[in-house]
């Protein structure tokens, strides 16, 4: 008998499964609304011109390929913390933070989860919004933490369940961990408004919860990086010492380069140094040190004034295209004569939209119209273009009328 006779076939990844089925479809009108990557208005992958310029500058320098330190490229870490917390952040100025480079957002989450598993002595309990990004559960679970949920999305309004969220958060046991999406909540596209964030912060402070922020879409949600980081900065201003995961996959289009950062805001600079030493001890047996190329690209963009300015315009361009596709989809549904209210599609923010379509309607869209999405009715608005938005609206109307 074999060593691995007892190993069962695992379930396929639900999102990658959508892409596989899409690839097999021969219909010329087919649409893939499952994939979490930006597409231009011709439906093609998009490399930001600022990224191309940064790559050219890096290539011209003929740099070596030596190892980075365990914590990553120093100037990248500093620039990432400034981008997230704001250049005038008191936490930055007083040096009471530590930022390490990570293998994109997933790697940052896992480093954070591993650190909590080892050093957060108060609780094993992590509370995720319901629903949350599918990968959050295995990341925290595999790091040895216990998962729970708090209400977040209201299927009746396709919006934020503020009453349910505040009620559930108020009942979370003291000194537990709460995960918060900083902006462009994935998968729902539903974010709290600033006044609602203030109420959440009050409860987090009152219950002495540890706030764990995941910010995968800074700049990509509203088109304004400062606006998208508002909640994180507000929490820190309120004296809540958070940790934060950043990803440059979406906002710089550096998906396959795996560029991210993990930041811990501490009580003082001495605590930050101690935390940093332990983060390095966790990282070393995971992957020794992070990859070089993507961090160089991001760092070059963030630290050169001209490139940074160009990049901010390009991020706004991507965000604006997505916002415009949302409004076009809503107006096309009205044109089709749909009697349903689709306003939530325009109200939600970021790459993803929770349409409110039921699993059987999703199935019909795939079978009858070759439109692919996950069963929960989540669509990637990045897959919608001015060329196919009319077809999508027609198809949605057909399965919902």
UniProtKB/Swiss-Prot annotation:
The modification 3'-nitrotyrosine is found at residue 67. The modification Phosphotyrosine is found at residue 67. The modification Phosphothreonine is found at residue 19. The modification N6-acetyllysine is found at residues 30, 44, 53, 61, 78, 93, 130, 156, 205, 250, 267, 273, 280, 309, 316, 334-335, 358, 367, 375. The modification Asymmetric dimethylarginine is found at residue 284. Its cofactor is pyridoxal 5'-phosphate. NCBIfam families: PRK09257.1 (NF006719). Belongs to the class-I pyridoxal-phosphate-dependent aminotransferase family. This is Aspartate aminotransferase, mitochondrial. The lineage of its organism: Eukaryota, Metazoa, Chordata, Craniata, Vertebrata. The gene is GOT2.
């Amino acid at each position: 008998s074999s060593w691995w006779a007892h190993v069962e076939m695992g379930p396929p990844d639900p999102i990658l499964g959508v892409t596989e089925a899409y690839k097999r479809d021969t219909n010329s009108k087919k649409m893939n609304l499952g994939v979490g990557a930006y597409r231009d208005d011709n439906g093609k992958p998009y490399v930001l011109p600022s990224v191309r310029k940064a790559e050219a500058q890096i290539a011209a320098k003929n740099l070596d390929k030596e190892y980075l330190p365990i914590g990553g490229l120093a100037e990248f870490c500093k620039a990432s913390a400034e981008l997230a917390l704001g250049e005038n952040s008191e936490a930055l100025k007083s040096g009471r933070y530590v930022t390490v480079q990570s293998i994109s957002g997933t790697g940052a989450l896992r480093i954070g989860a591993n650190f909590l598993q080892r050093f957060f002595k108060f609780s094993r309990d992590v509370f995720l919004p319901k629903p949350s990004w599918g990968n959050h559960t295995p990341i925290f679970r595999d790091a040895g933490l216990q998962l729970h949920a708090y209400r977040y999305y209201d299927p009746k309004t396709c919006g934020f369940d503020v009453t349910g969220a505040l009620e559930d958060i108020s009942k979370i046991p003291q000194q537990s961990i709460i995960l918060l999406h900083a902006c462009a909540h994935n998968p729902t596209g539903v974010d709290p408004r600033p006044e609602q964030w203030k109420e959440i912060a009050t409860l987090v402070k009152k219950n002495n919860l540890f706030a764990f922020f995941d910010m995968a879409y800074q700049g990509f949600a509203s088109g304004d990086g400062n606006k998208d980081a508002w909640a994180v900065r507000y929490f820190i201003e309120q004296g809540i010492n958070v940790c934060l995961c950043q990803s440059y996959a979406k906002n710089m289009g550096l998906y396959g380069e795996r560029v991210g950062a993990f930041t811990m805001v501490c009580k003082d600079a001495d605590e930050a140094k101690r935390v940093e030493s332990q983060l390095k001890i966790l990282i070393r047996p995971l992957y020794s040190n992070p990859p070089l190329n993507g961090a160089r690209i991001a760092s070059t963009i963030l630290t050169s004034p001209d490139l940074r300015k160009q990049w901010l315009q390009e991020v706004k361009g991507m965000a604006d295209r997505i916002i415009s596709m949302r409004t076009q989809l809503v107006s096309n549904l009205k044109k089709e004569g749909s009697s349903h209210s689709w306003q939530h599609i325009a109200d939600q923010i970021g790459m993803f939209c929770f349409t409110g379509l039921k699993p059987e309607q999703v199935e019909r869209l795939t079978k009858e119209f070759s439109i692919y999405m996950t069963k929960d009715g989540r669509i990637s608005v990045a897959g919608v273009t001015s060329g196919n938005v009319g077809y999508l609206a027609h198809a949605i109307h057909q399965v919902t009328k």
